[in-house]
Amino acid sequence: MPVRKQDTQRALHLLEEYRSKLSQTEDRQLRSSIERVINIFQSNLFQALIDIQEFYEVTLLDNPKCIDRSKQSEPIQPVNTWEISSLPSTTVTSETLPSSLSPSVEKYRYQDEDTPPQEHISPQITNEVIGPELVHVSEKNLSEIENVHGFVSHSHISPIKPTEAVPPSSPTVPVIPVLPVPAENTVILPTIPQANPPPVLVNTDSLETSTYVNGTDADYEYEEITLERGNSGLGFSIAGGTDNPHIGDDSSIFITKIIAGGAAAQDGRLRVNDCILRVNEVDVRDVTHSKAVEALKEAGSIVRLYVKRRKPVSEKIMEIKLIKGPKGLGFSIAGGVGNQHIPGDNSIYVTKIIEGGAAHKDGKLQIGDKLLAVNSVCLEEVTHEEAVTALKNTSDFVYLKVAKPTSMYMNDGYAPPDITNSSSQPVDNHVSPSSYLGHTPASPARYSPVSKAMLGDDEITREPRKVVLHRGSTGLGFNIVGGEDGEGIFISFILAGGPADLSGELRKGDRIISVNSVDLRTASHEQAAAALKNAGQAVTIVAQYRPEEYSRFEAKIHDLREQMMNSSISSGSGSLRTSQKRSLYVRALFDYDKTKDSGLPSQGLNFKFGDILHVINASDDEWWQARQVTPDGESDEVGVIPSKRRVEKKERARLKTVKFNSKTRGDKGQSFNDKRKKNLFSRKFPFYKNKDQSEQETSDADQHITSNASDSESSYRGQEEYVLSYEPVNQQEVNYTRPVIILGPMKDRINDDLISEFPDKFGSCVPHTTRPKRDYEVDGRDYHFVTSREQMEKDIQEHKFIEAGQYNNHLYGTSVQSVREVAEKGKHCILDVSGNAIKRLQIAQLYPISIFIKPKSMENIMEMNKRLTEEQARKTFERAMKLEQEFTEHFTAIVQGDTLEDIYNQVKQIIEEQSGPYIWVPAKEKL
């Protein structure tokens, strides 16, 4: 049945009549659905498609109306002629019209047949004035347009190029020829004169590509997210912009980190890799990074984000039965814990199907498939070695559980595999010699959306190739080795998420031939590093994949490292690149897990906050060799740890972020660390802390909120953040019992329990006061009563007190001498003081055992103290976090536990281990 515009209008009229009758509450959902359908009927795009359909059926398919080809060049009659110059026009971007025609995009509707459309503007996308449209439609024969919905779902609307529009001076347009349509670049389709709609320019020969990498609008979903700015800002980090694209040449603004506990995390809708289109009314497409940051900073307390994200790729789980042949299972794998094939994904992936093997003959397993299990052995969250072992230890009949991507699209970042033989280690028990079989194209049925980064070794050309990288805030995102005796410079590590990783063009084992035309074939390591460092923002690298050379080089380096370690243990000498070594003892000020450090050059060494490490070789800028020092002596195990420089560099990169909080009050030029020093050293009377000063200190943490971020992100911190790494220490013998300072939630109960359980080991000191003695009090037992206020103030100025305060116009304080008296009696003096007292005791040569109780969460605090309300627990948790931030380097140890008993037992153990007589104290030397 032919489509008529009158039929569309009648359907619209009937829908509107039916909608008006839906007045009951229970009809609300149905009414909303009908309104969406009405909006589609009234949209300008829908009207244009009806015009095309009607013209196609009424004019082109009607033989009497066919026009003689010989008259194609003649002007048509006025009824089919438009004056192009008089037509207003606008562009419709691909972002404004996703294929779903959802209400989140702009709606264009006619008020009646003869008037231009009115503006119906959604703030999500654009503020352009809407008029008659000039739109591109992707290449499609008109004969394929058999229904409107099918046409819409296969069309891509994109901005029209000015050079492709018909010049305004053209008085007429050529006649439309009879089907099939010749290959003219642009044709203009008139409609019947009764409707008189605006013209639609249909480009049948070209398609404007999307401004976004890897995918068209059909691959994305859109969402509006409203966030309320909290004390820590919006709680996410961004990267990208026209001046520093985050992924390839895509200038979009991407979400790179969601901060735990922040506004975005609490809302739960925003995701990493979401692309921000608008912030409130500000369009942040195709803007610089700083413009996007400014838009977020100036957005106010309620922030509306309009984002788009790639639709998730669904997976189909299936079981495949393979029968081993002479070539084994006949496929290769990559991935696993500690050896991720795709950044952020520990899964095991199929990277190669070997021709003639069991998998190839079966035909079901494809490159890009994810292996979930082999027989009854789970392959999720396992190492690469464990997966290989599981596959090799199978019988002749093997059952594979695999996850197959079911997405139908293939985009720029994906490619169908070429079936070639494997030069990498296949997963089978019979590895045949590698031989080149040529590039045999796979059948379409075997195409799968597998990333180019997932292809095997022999898909990588062995010829020199040119790669262009754009430097991120922390560099190019790869490590190099080599440069000795002209052996070449090789890439040894690709940083996940860095520029090199995101480009997908470099890999471990590449030899760097040149950097920005600087020949590095015979360069030393230092020369190569300098060339890369000074290469500027855009770096052109010529690289050649040489895995065999790199493997030989890596084996040699490993042998040298082993020799270095052995000689270091036996004689204390020997180094890879330096003959002189530094040896020192340090206290770790952070936890280190070697399994999470992918850049380790050799066997790593785990440690926790407060551990003492004997660094036996600190000659290298990036890595040190060390042994752990225990109460029983030094461990025999020698391992590699990150150097102070490396720790601080990585932590500063992690802390780089955009602060989306509002403008700070006062002292904007003064860093948090400056204030810490001022609070710690500059106050002559620390007890004189008025209300304003206290409020200012409380707000400091709020004004310097940071969040985790990735490489290519900006920092709006005023000054460089102080990073804790290692503290140099010396061993010292003490002839006193060390004081004990416990900080954090539940400290009072821990203190009381220690004195109650071990009254012979723990005690408290007698404080000083200028308050008059009461009748029942004894001087020296209850207080040391000071008759002269001036004298006590003088003693405070001379640092004879570790802490003092004022109450009811009387001074109270704890003197160094009072603490010393308890210590010399062989008891641990339990001190209820602030973190500032730790440093003052150290200056007085009374090194305390300072233990911080770090709560795991608000709920953890409420579980241990059930009398607290949620608000009290929240404030306690915040105070603890601020305490940790301010005094971490002065803590002897940090403890955490689920119960009070657990924490108490840890505290007792730490005090026992740290009691002496040999203790580690801060050294004066600098690292």
Swiss-Prot record:
Phosphorylated by MAPK12. Phosphorylation of Ser-232 regulates association with GRIN2A. Residues 691-719 are annotated as: Disordered. Residues 581-651 form the SH3 domain. Keywords: Cell junction, Cell membrane, Cytoplasm, Endoplasmic reticulum, Membrane, Phosphoprotein, Repeat, SH3 domain, Synapse, Ubl conjugation. Pfam families: Guanylate_kin, L27_1, MAGUK_N_PEST, PDZ, PDZ_assoc, SH3_1. It is found in: Cell membrane; Basolateral cell membrane; Endoplasmic reticulum membrane; Postsynaptic density. GO terms for cellular component: apical plasma membrane; basement membrane; basolateral plasma membrane; bicellular tight junction; cell projection membrane; cytoplasmic side of plasma membrane; endoplasmic reticulum membrane; glutamatergic synapse. GO terms for biological process: actin filament polymerization; amyloid precursor protein metabolic process; astral microtubule organization; bicellular tight junction assembly; branching involved in ureteric bud morphogenesis; cell-cell adhesion; chemical synaptic transmission; cortical actin cytoskeleton organization. The modification Phosphothreonine is found at residue 115. Residues 704-717 have a biased composition (Polar residues). Residues 224-546 are annotated as: Required for interaction with MARCHF2. One of its GO terms (molecular function) is transmembrane transporter binding. InterPro entries: DLG1-4_PDZ_assoc, DLG1-like, DLG1_PEST_dom, GK/Ca_channel_bsu, Guanylate_kin-like_dom, Guanylate_kinase_CS, L27_1, L27_dom. Residues 4-64 form the L27 domain. The modification Phosphoserine is found at residues 122, 138, 158, 232, 568, 573, 575, 579, 598, 619, 707, 710, 857. Residues 230-317, 325-412, 474-555 form the PDZ domain. Residues 683-858 form the Guanylate kinase-like domain. Residues 162-212 are annotated as: Interaction with SH3 domains. The modification Phosphotyrosine is found at residue 399. The PDZ domains may also mediate association to membranes by binding to EPB41 and ADGRA2 together with the L27 domain that binds CASK and DLG2. Belongs to the MAGUK family. Homotetramer. Interacts (via guanylate kinase-like domain) with DLGAP1, DLGAP2, DLGAP3, DLGAP4 and MAP1A. Interacts (via guanylate kinase-like domain) with KIF13B. May interact with HTR2A. Interacts (via PDZ domains) with GRIA1. Interacts (via PDZ domains) with GRIN2A. Interacts (via PDZ domains) with KCND2 and KCND3. Interacts (via PDZ domains) with KCNA1, KCNA2, KCNA3 and KCNA4. Interacts (via PDZ domains) with ADGRA3. Interacts with KCNF1. Interacts with CAMK2. Interacts with cytoskeleton-associated protein EPB41. Interacts with cytoskeleton-associated protein EZR. Essential multidomain scaffolding protein required for normal development. Recruits channels, receptors and signaling molecules to discrete plasma membrane domains in polarized cells. Promotes epithelial cell layer barrier function via maintaining cell-cell adhesion. May also play a role in adherens junction assembly, signal transduction, cell proliferation, synaptogenesis and lymphocyte activation. Regulates the excitability of cardiac myocytes by modulating the functional expression of Kv4 channels. Functional regulator of Kv1.5 channel. This is Disks large homolog 1. It comes from Canis lupus familiaris (Dog). The gene is DLG1.
